[in-house]
């Protein structure tokens, strides 16, 4: 009886080729049906859609190809992202890091789809350029104006980024089958998904700072959920609890941030437009899928690995929701159809009628729903870990908790207060924001020791189960990628070179123009600063540590480079980001070059406070290590003394025994 039951269970855990083939057929038929509906929408709404936006009509081909291509390319990217995450979360790697056979099947899915994704993204560059110029693709290519049309189209440039990232993913998936490779490939895949999400409606008009941040989170969450649904349907097994938790989390994020985007794009929640109706349709589908996932997670816990049916239905539902979003992406949001755009709307998304003061910096808030929300989540997660340790009766230094929470609070303030609001329009305030993100906040976060806390809180996965969060974190800590990035020399080069590369090249002209550029700079400087200070005062395991004198030397070695950077900004006669700052044309700012010189002075002077903080932390750590070493040596000395006495006593007993014989 027991053997039969075990055999039956083992058999049910392996998806049969027939079940996989049926799932693939259902998804293929559903995909063709969804594409047909999207094509019909593009054909029927074509001329009217362009007339409402005041754009020239490029013809029926572009009117149909744009929404269909947008949907197909977005779906391919989502499937690649979901497949990679599925492999990362379900694989049972061999000792050499190679993924197991079950995960390799999903790897092959991502490998095949990535090539299709590349082709679709490259095609969309031409289609999007034709859409924005109002001519057909053949005429555009024949005129030789394709490059100029692409340069003038933000969405076409977004598709170029997506195509480049898809090329990287497609090439790497054919070369690497190790677990770590899939983790690394999440970076270009997410970048590709975000590249097209931040163009179009989210990147223009009033409140586009809110919309861009929301679009980034929504696009990644929605693509992850869609990709995981399709990957799970093709795998033919019930997703693990970790995958299901990820789906529920992504569904909640997509619903929350999607509602925010609809609020920003549809004035008064008016539902009398195609855009609004499509948004509501996507919302209803997404809500239904999310509620079903919540029921499976809370009421009917999953039994990972068991064969099941019904996965294709959720995957098809997410395809339909993505089709609705693709149709919305090629339309102009109702809010912008009658809005009279100003320079504030185009370049900032909000107005700054008065110059910055301390009171305005503290009270002018535009909460960053990406970085600010991340700061809130990190603070809550750390506090929960701290509380969990205390409930177990384990200790954790309160100073680390204070350092981490202070760093998170500073992150929320820097990204959402007047520092960011004025920093997006003034170079001097932007430089204060940059220095805070690069040199002050990372020190506090590193001193919090989040990795050590996580390793103490997260449970060890039992035998026979897929690795969990603790195992993933351990593998990442000891991976070659982490070893390279956290090496003191690598961290030093990144920390020193970053400001020169960003501000003294055309990169800054692009980044400062768009809100996603400000988000990218903030994340980049925060991560680079964290890597550098991790190598110097890090509590967590990971990077190769220099001796304490070497760490102090490394800290002082960066100071001349930052001083020269600040002095260069103070003495330059040309303006960094001149085109953008002239276009914003703040009425109360008399001179943008004088503001740049002030920013250089801020960069030069603000390096001292973080250095003092790091020196204090280093000296404290050094003194504690010396005390530990001295205490250990004292214990060894005491132990040696006791051992000598014991040996003498035993020798005496042996001698007495010999004399008695």
Swiss-Prot record:
InterPro entries referenced in this protein's UniProt entry, alphabetically: Caa3_assmbl_CtaG-rel (IPR019108)
Coiled coil: none
Record keywords, A-Z: Cell membrane, Membrane, Transmembrane, Transmembrane helix
Note from the entry: Was identified as a high-confidence drug target.
Pfam families (alphabetical): Caa3_CtaG
Membrane-crossing segments per the record: 27-47, 68-88, 116-136, 150-170, 179-199, 214-234, 251-271, 279-299, 313-333, 369-389, 396-416, 435-455, 488-508, 519-539, 552-572, 599-619
Subcellular location: Cell membrane
Primary site of residence: membrane
Claim: Cell membrane is one of the keywords in the record: yes
GO cellular component: plasma membrane
Protein's name according to its UniProt entry: Uncharacterized protein Rv0102
Membrane association type: Multi-pass membrane protein
Species per Swiss-Prot/TrEMBL record: Mycobacterium tuberculosis (strain ATCC 25618 / H37Rv)
Family: To M.leprae ML1998.
Nucleotide-binding recorded as keyword: no
């Amino acid at each position: 009886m027991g053997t039969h039951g075990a055999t039956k269970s083992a058999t049910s855990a392996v998806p049969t080729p027939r079940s996989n083939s049926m799932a693939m057929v259902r998804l293929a038929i559903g995909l063709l049906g969804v594409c047909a509906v999207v094509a019909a929408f593009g054909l029927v709404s074509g001329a009217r859609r362009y007339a409402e936006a005041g754009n020239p009509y490029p013809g029926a081909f572009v009117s149909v190809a744009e929404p269909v291509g947008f949907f197909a390319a977005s779906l391919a990217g989502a499937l690649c992202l979901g497949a990679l995450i599925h492999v990362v979360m379900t694989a049972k790697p061999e000792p050499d890091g190679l993924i197991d056979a079950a995960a390799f099947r999903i790897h092959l899915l991502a490998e095949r789809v990535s090539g299709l994704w590349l082709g679709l993204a490259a095609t969309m560059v031409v289609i999007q350029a034709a859409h924005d110029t109002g001519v057909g693709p053949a005429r555009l290519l024949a005129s030789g104006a394709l490059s100029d049309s692409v340069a003038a189209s933000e969405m076409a440039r977004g598709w170029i980024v997506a195509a480049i990232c898809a090329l990287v993913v497609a090439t790497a998936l054919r070369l690497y089958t190790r677990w770590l490779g899939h983790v690394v490939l999440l970076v270009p895949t997410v970048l590709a998904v975000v590249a097209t999400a931040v163009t179009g409606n989210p990147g223009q008009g009033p409140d586009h700072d809110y919309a861009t941040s929301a679009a980034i989170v929504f696009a990644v969450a929605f693509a992850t959920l869609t990709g995981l649904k399709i990957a799970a349907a093709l795998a033919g097994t019930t997703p693990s609890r970790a995958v299901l938790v990820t789906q529920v989390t992504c569904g909640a994020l997509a619903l929350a941030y999607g509602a925010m985007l609809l609020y920003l794009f549809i004035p008064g929640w008016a539902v009398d437009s195609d855009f609004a109706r499509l948004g509501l349709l996507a919302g209803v589908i997404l809500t239904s899928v999310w509620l079903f996932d919540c029921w499976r997670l809370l009421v009917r816990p999953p039994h990972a690995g068991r064969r099941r049916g019904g996965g294709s239905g959720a995957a098809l539902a997410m395809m339909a929701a993505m089709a609705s979003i693709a149709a919305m992406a090629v339309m102009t949001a109702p809010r912008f159809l009658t809005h009279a755009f100003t320079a504030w709307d185009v370049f900032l998304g909000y107005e700054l009628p008065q110059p910055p003061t301390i009171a305005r910096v503290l009270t002018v808030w535009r909460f960053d729903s990406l970085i600010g929300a991340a700061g809130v989540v990190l603070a809550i997660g750390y506090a929960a870990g701290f509380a969990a340790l205390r409930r177990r009766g384990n200790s954790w230094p309160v100073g680390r908790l204070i350092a981490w929470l202070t760093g998170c609070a500073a992150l929320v303030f820097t990204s959402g207060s007047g520092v960011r609001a004025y920093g997006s329009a003034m170079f001097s305030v932007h430089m204060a924001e940059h220095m805070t993100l690069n040199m002050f906040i990372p020190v506090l976060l590193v001193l919090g020791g989040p990795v050590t806390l996580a390793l103490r809180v997260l449970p060890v996965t039992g035998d026979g189960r897929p690795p969990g969060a603790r195992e993933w974190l351990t593998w990442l800590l000891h991976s070659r990628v982490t070893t390279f990035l956290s090496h003191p020399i690598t961290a030093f080069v990144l920390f020193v070179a970053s400001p020169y590369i960003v501000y003294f090249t055309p990169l800054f002209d692009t980044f400062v123009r768009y809100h996603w550029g400000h988000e990218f700079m903030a994340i980049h400087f925060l991560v680079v600063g964290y890597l550098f200070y991790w190598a110097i005062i890090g509590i967590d395991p990971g990077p190769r540590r220099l001796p304490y004198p070497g760490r102090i030397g490394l800290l002082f070695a960066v100071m001349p480079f930052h001083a020269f950077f600040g002095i260069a900004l103070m003495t330059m006669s040309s303006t960094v980001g001149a085109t953008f700052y002239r276009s914003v044309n703040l009425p109360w700012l008399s001179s943008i070059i004088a503001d740049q010189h002030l920013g250089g002075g801020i960069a030069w002077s603000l390096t001292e406070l973080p250095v003092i903080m790091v020196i204090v932390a280093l000296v404290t750590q050094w003194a504690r290590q010396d005390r530990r070493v001295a205490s250990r040596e004292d214990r060894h000395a005491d132990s040696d003394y006791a051992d000598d006495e014991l040996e003498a006593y035993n020798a005496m007993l042996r001698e007495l025994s010999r004399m008695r014989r």
